[in-house]
Each structure stands twice: as structure tokens, then as C-alpha cells.
Amino acid sequence: MSPIVKTDYSLYLVTDRSLLNGKDLMESIEAAIKGGVSIVQLREKQATSAVFYETALALKKLTDQYQIPLIINDRLDIALAVDAAGLHIGPDDLPIKKARELLGPHKTLGYSAATLAEALEAESLGANYLGVGALFPTKTKKDTESVSLQLLQKIKSSVSIPIVGIGGISQGNASQVIQSGADGIAVVSAILSKQYPEIAAKNLYLKTQNK
């Protein structure tokens, strides 16, 4: 069930327009990619389907230009419509088995897991990677369960697919996440809320290399 190309999950950017403080979304993402972001997830919880689709199309062109994967949050239809690299879902979304069936065997399927049981089930049903968190307090998602670094280590040792730590990750704690066994870190505000996303991404990328 693995994608044909091995994916680099080191620095995983999840988008959130509300953090841009007047900056342009595409320009900020491009700057972050130049700084070391290796994969981008488009998350548009407030957008209409039309806006989500148009944004995804534009972002697909950008990520293709830099040869990095575009993952779509939640919306299987958008992921298929723009031929994104994959889809990311969680416990409240489409069941993993059905998502995998509709997505096909060669697209990347990510799943948000907050327990060992969720992680094991997701792997068994076809997930290619796991987003594990929230590891630290976060303002970008209100409905998250808290996950300890010890649990992240336990999940990492129990599954064979990559693990991406998420939730309140910043320059100050990124190294802890990597040293706990995560294959990468997923960040939102640590890049997008900053005045210079490229510099923020570069500093975080350096943290991911200290394994």
C-alpha cells in the first residue's frame, strides 16, 4: 500500500489562513518550501468547496514546481479532483478503509492518531503515515487530545509506517519530538504566523536533522 515514491516527512507544513497576518498564502507556502518544508497539507476548514478547489489547484502547481507532495485535509473529492499526492483524515472523517478504497493503492493516506489503538488500526486499514498529537498545547485546533512524547515513542515502536509529531511544535521543542522517534514534525503557526516563513522553516528544518 506504500506510495511509489518514498515521502520525506521531515518538515510537514499544515496550512491555516487565519495565521497569515495579511501575508499571501501562496507566497508564504513557497517561502516555507524554500526554507526546507518537504510536504504540504492544505487545510481549509472555513472555505467553500469552490475556494478550496481553486486554492488546491494553485497549490498543486506550486508543489509540483518544487517536486514535493501536496496532501489534502479531509476532502477526498478535492484530493482526487486536483490529483493531489494524497489525503489526510482523522477519527471524525471518512472511515480509513473506505478512503483507501476510493483513493486507490498508489496515493498517500495519512491519519491523525492520539492513541496506540488508533495507530495500529489505521496502519492495518491502509494508512501510509500517522500524525500523532497533540504533543503540546495548540491554538490551531481546539478539539485535540493530549499525547505524551512517551506515547509517541510507544506508537513509533509498534508500527512500521512513518510517524509525524503534531500539536504546538515550535523551535523550542522540535528537537524533543525528533529525538523521541518521530520521522518528522508537522507545524502550522511556527511557520505561517511568522513574518519571514522561509527563515522560520530553515530553523525548524535544522532541528529535524538532529536525530
Swiss-Prot record:
Q: Does the keyword Acetylation apply?
A: no
* NCBIfam families (UniProt xref): thiE
Gene behind this chain? thiE
| Organism taxonomic ancestry | Bacteria, Bacillati, Bacillota, Clostridia, Peptostreptococcales
Among the GO biological process terms of this entry, one is: thiamine biosynthetic process
Provide the cofactor note recorded for this chain's UniProt entry: Binds 1 Mg(2+) ion per subunit.
Q: What is this protein called?
A: Thiamine-phosphate synthase
Q: In which pathway does it act?
A: Cofactor biosynthesis; thiamine diphosphate biosynthesis; thiamine phosphate from 4-amino-2-methyl-5-diphosphomethylpyrimidine and 4-methyl-5-(2-phosphoethyl)-thiazole: step 1/1
- Name the residues that bind 2-[(2R,5Z)-2-carboxy-4-methylthiazol-5(2H)-ylidene]ethyl phosphate: 138-140, 168, 188-189
What's the superkingdom here?
Bacteria
Q: Which PANTHER family match?
A: THIAMINE BIOSYNTHETIC BIFUNCTIONAL ENZYME, THIAMINE-PHOSPHATE PYROPHOSPHORYLASE
Q: Give a GO cellular-component term.
A: cytoplasm
Q: What is its EC number?
A: 2.5.1.3
